[in-house]
A protein has these predicted regions:
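ASCE RecA-like P-loop NTPase motor cores
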Residues: 1-466
């Protein structure tokens, strides 16, 4: 709602209700035979059904979930309750507008004290960060004060119903932190300014998905290019709450692309020293020169992307671009350049097409292992040892993400591309070499830059080199 400028709750007596485009959308959404929505909206509708609230979608007889590899992340987001500084300010403002100025002032003071209790010792944090919640005596006292005020606010006369609901939700969330409820993963999310958001993630996402979507017994089809990790669907089945369902029908469509002829997989020669940013920049320069530009360089970290990009400055004559978050305009400029070099991270790992020769060199700087956070810390504790956790969770997630990034290389049957993975752990003889190869289609590999040059000469037309 907040992303489309719709209030958290719409009063039933709103005089614009009949003309409101959002309300009209809700009415129209009950009419069509085929309904299209994103994952979050689907899960919100499922939540409404379980709670006997008004439906967001018409009752359906079949469900098709595209890009289903993203559904677990959407579910984690939907099943995580949060209370941010903005939410706190909004509650105080709503109380003030309801003519409870003194009460709003008390609540604002209590919220500030609670936030302060979570920001002590933050000098070591750099940028955004998440930390597991620890219930200190200071935080306990601050939580008790906030909960008491929220509870008292719920008993005030003439408070609008939607505000009562918001106050009740905030009280319930803070109680989770006070009681340290074991079915919730409690952590503090700090923004770039160090302001804390209280987050309570569910530790039962697969079970919640099972109740929300699969126990309806309606037929469901889940599609994606990366549902399987190294050809195995079991990890995705576990994340989606489908592991207990039998029989499940699996179908794998072979790629129409001739990777053995049209793709060359390059690993840098193995050396004893670790590849730091300077050595990585030198390797990127060699590859870009060998392929005459036409390069996409994918990073897992925006910070590393910026540092390596700076080290390559002035090392080639090809137009060079750097895509930050929301970098659609920069990506379009790269596509129009013809032979440019694009440094990118984040969303460029998937969902963006680079057909033709514009990406004839795909460089993957690091294997895309998931970034540790309080939720992954909780998951790790569910395994008897670290090795079992890495094999069961971390490697399959890396393989699916690696396959998504690899998919930027060849988008049509006429495309050809060199894919270079610079992470020494993925190289020949590296710790994760076999895991990386298992995630990718079979194609020839090399450690020689001369093979890269020859591949480009054989695959590309003369106008490619102009």
């Amino acid at each position: 709602r907040c992303r489309i400028c719709v209030p958290q709750s719409c009063p039933r007596d709103c005089f614009l209700r009949e003309d409101c485009r959002y309300q009209q959308y809700l009415r129209d959404s009950m009419k069509p035979d085929i309904q299209i929505c994103n994952h979050n909206y689907l899960l919100a509708d499922a939540s409404h059904r379980l709670e006997d609230r008004p439906l967001l979608l018409r009752s359906y007889q079949a469900l098709v979930v595209d890009e289903a590899h993203k559904l677990p992340d959407a579910a984690r987001q939907m099943y995580t309750e949060t209370l941010s500084p903005h939410n706190m300010d909004e509650l105080c403002l709503l109380l003030q507008q309801a003519h409870y100025k003194d009460f709003a002032r008390q609540m604002r003071t209590a919220f500030l004290t609670l936030s302060f209790s979570c920001t002590q010792g933050l000098s070591k944090l750099r940028g955004k960060a998440s930390e597991p919640f620890v219930l200190t005596p200071f935080r306990r006292a601050a939580l008790i004060d906030c909960i008491a005020l929220l509870q008292n606010a719920g008993g005030l006369p003439d408070v609008p119903r939607y505000l009562l609901n918001r106050l009740g939700e905030a009280e319930s969330l803070l109680r989770l932190f006070l009681l340290e409820v074991p079915t919730r993963i409690l952590y503090i999310d700090y923004d770039i300014d160090g302001q804390p958001t209280f987050c309570a993630a569910s530790s039962r996402v697969p079970q919640l998905l099972r109740s929300a979507l699969w126990n309806t017994r309606e037929p469901a089809i889940l599609t994606s290019g990366t549902l399987a990790a190294a050809g195995d669907f079991s990890h995705t089945e576990q994340l989606l709450g489908l592991a207990a369902y039998r029989p499940l029908r699996h179908f794998r469509a072979d790629s129409p692309f001739n990777y053995k002829k049209k793709c060359l997989l390059y690993f840098p020669p193995r050396v004893k020293t670790r590849m730091d940013n300077r050595k990585m920049a030198e390797e990127i320069v060699r590859l870009v020169d060998a392929c005459h530009g036409h390069a996409l360089v994918l990073f897992t970290s925006y910070r590393q992307m910026a540092e390596v990009r700076a080290l390559t400055d002035g090392q080639w004559q090809y137009p060079t671009y750097q895509a930050w978050r929301n970098g659609g305009r920069v990506i379009q400029q790269f596509k129009e350049s013809g032979n440019g070099v694009l440094f990118a991270a984040g969303s460029c790992w998937e969902g963006i097409d680079f057909p033709g020769d514009m990406v004839s060199l795909l460089i993957i700087a690091k294997l895309p292992f998931p970034i540790p956070d309080p939720v992954s810390d909780y998951e790790r504790r569910q395994y008897p040892n670290l090795r079992d956790y890495i094999n069961a969770e971390i490697i399959p997630e890396m393989q699916k993400k690696l396959r998504q990034g690899f998919g930027r290389a060849i988008r049509t049957e006429q495309d050809s591309c060199v894919v270079a993975i610079l992470d020494e752990r993925a190289g020949i003889g590296g710790k994760y070499h076999d895991a990386a190869l298992a995630a990718l289609p079979a194609c020839p590999t090399t450690e020689k830059i001369e093979d890269v040059q020859q591949f480009i000469r054989e695959q590309k037309r003369p106008d490619y080199f102009l």
